[in-house]
Swiss-Prot record:
The gene is murD. One of its GO terms (cellular component) is cytoplasm. This is UDP-N-acetylmuramoylalanine--D-glutamate ligase. Pfam families: Mur_ligase_C, Mur_ligase_M, MurD-like_N. Pathway: Cell wall biogenesis; peptidoglycan biosynthesis. One of its GO terms (molecular function) is UDP-N-acetylmuramoylalanine-D-glutamate ligase activity. The keyword Iron does not apply.
Length: 448
């Protein structure tokens, strides 16, 4: 029999992190209850015996009995049931806050509108290859509290704005906001609310990494906090950036020291150069040896559906960036690949479209004008996108992804690239962005 500790902990919202929080608190000997608005929420069968459950609606009465509410990231703190508890002085936190209380293991904390998963995975591999006992998760892969079972000496966490909303004083060893562009405004109200949520990652951080190409990523932290920047320009002393030789060779560099040629990376595109530089800065902050980090970097193949190289057909390279579900991600992909192939006079054939989530597609216009020879539009918001980019380049329409890929093949020649980076959600035509990416790969593989 577990000895009950403290007052009642109520987990609001199940799902992956909710189940993880319920089990963690139960194992710690707390009195736990869980409520979810869904009649049979995912993970309901993984709740230990002795935990009170209330499903079908958020149980206001139960929430008001709580000493503390653990809110799942999918639920907004603005919900009336949660606001009523806050008004009564009940503490509302998330699983990341529980993690911070439970351990003093150093945390590498990563957020940003785009590239979070790539950077989180890569810095995790760098730490592992350098001999660290590291656990990687959070918003990516395993829920944060489950990572403690590994008894790691280092935690690498990808954190979403939703997770950061309920996190205070994370006290990370090093924290970074990789970039900021419009996303989740339906939840945060406006860009300011989104920015404030993201920047909670810096509370109590011992060291900070920021993107000097993106003013919104730079934190307001005490002058005494060590800060290191990365960017796609020549770096100052002890900062990370790029240096270009007279013959056009591009180097990733720290100050004046050339570290590795961009052509030696498997992951291509300038946005991936930025991701690699961010990882080198994060790795330096936690004391990883440079030689080991560069070796990991050379081997890293990138993640599925994130500017993933598929194959070359008739000297045209095909890239699957199905995870590009917002304008910022697609901009990074167009600019990244466009700049990389410009030297050889290559151009981008871009497949765009899906469910636009009310975004403004106007910011895509100048990059499309500069790098794209054709845009093929698919999905329900094709007319909205067409209006925003009209006149920037040639625009074609396709009823299916297969037709879109075939049109791109027809429009391209040697040194060009075909890029699926829809800037939209996938649910109008596909089960998920994974499904969309897999179908794209299948279409490319069937080209002759």
């Amino acid at each position: 029999m577990l000895i009950q500790r403290g007052g009642l902990k109520v987990v609001a919202g199940l799902g992956i992190s909710g189940v993880s929080a319920v089990n963690f608190l139960h194992e710690q000997g707390y009195q736990v209850a869980v409520t979810d608005s869904r009649p049979t929420p995912p993970g309901h069968d993984q709740i230990p015996a002795g935990v009170k459950t209330s499903f079908g609606q958020l149980d206001q009465e139960l929430l008001l009995q709580a000493e503390e509410i653990i809110l799942s990231p999918g639920l907004a703190p603005q919900l009336p049931e949660i606001q009523a508890a806050i008004a009564k002085g009940i503490s509302v936190v998330g699983d990341i806050q529980l993690l911070r209380r439970a351990t003093d293991v150093p945390i590498v904390a990563i957020t940003g509108s785009n590239a979070k998963s790539t950077v989180t995975t890569l810095i995790g591999l760098m730490a592992k290859d350098a001999g660290k006992k590291v656990a990687v998760g959070g918003n990516l892969g395993r829920p944060a509290l489950d990572l403690l079972k590994d008894q790691p000496e280092l935690l690498v966490l990808e954190l979403s704005s939703f997770q950061l909303e309920t996190t205070s004083h994370l006290n990370a060893e090093v924290a970074v906001v990789l970039n900021m562009s419009e996303d989740h405004l339906d939840r945060h109200g406006n860009m300011l609310g989104y920015h404030q949520a993201k920047h909670r990652i810096f509370q109590g951080a011992k060291k900070v990494v920021f993107n000097r190409d993106d003013a919104l990523s730079r934190p307001l932290v005490p002058d005494t906090t060590p800060m290191q920047s990365f960017g796609l320009n020549a770096p100052d002393l002890n900062q990370y950036g790029v240096l270009r030789d007279a013959d056009g060779t591009l180097w990733l560099a720290r100050g004046l020291q050339r570290l590795i040629k961009s052509s030696d990376l498997y992951i291509q595109g300038m946005h991936n150069v930025a991701n690699a530089l961010a990882c080198l800065a994060l790795g330096e902050a936690i004391g990883l040896p440079m030689e080991s980090m560069l070796e990991t970097l050379k081997q890293f193949k990138g993640l599925e559906h994130r500017c993933e190289y598929v194959k070359t057909v008739h000297d045209v390279r095909y890239y699957n960036d199905s995870k590009g579900t917002n304008v910022g991600a697609t901009l990074a992909a167009i600019d990244g690949l466009g700049a990389a192939i410009e030297v050889k006079k290559g151009k981008v054939a871009l497949i765009l479209g899906g469910q636009g989530k009310g975004q403004d597609f106007g910011p895509l216009r100048s990059s499309i004008e500069k790098y794209a020879k054709v845009v093929v539009l698919i999905g329900e918001d094709a007319p909205v996108i067409e209006q925003a980019i009209q006149g920037a380049t040639k625009i074609l329409h396709a009823a299916t992804l297969k037709e879109a890929v075939e049109l791109c093949q027809r429009e391209t020649q040697a040194e060009d690239v075909v890029l699926l980076s829809p800037a939209c959600a996938s649910f109008d035509m596909f089960k998920s962005y994974n499904d969309r990416g897999q179908q794209f790969v299948a279409c490319v593989n069937s080209l002759v």
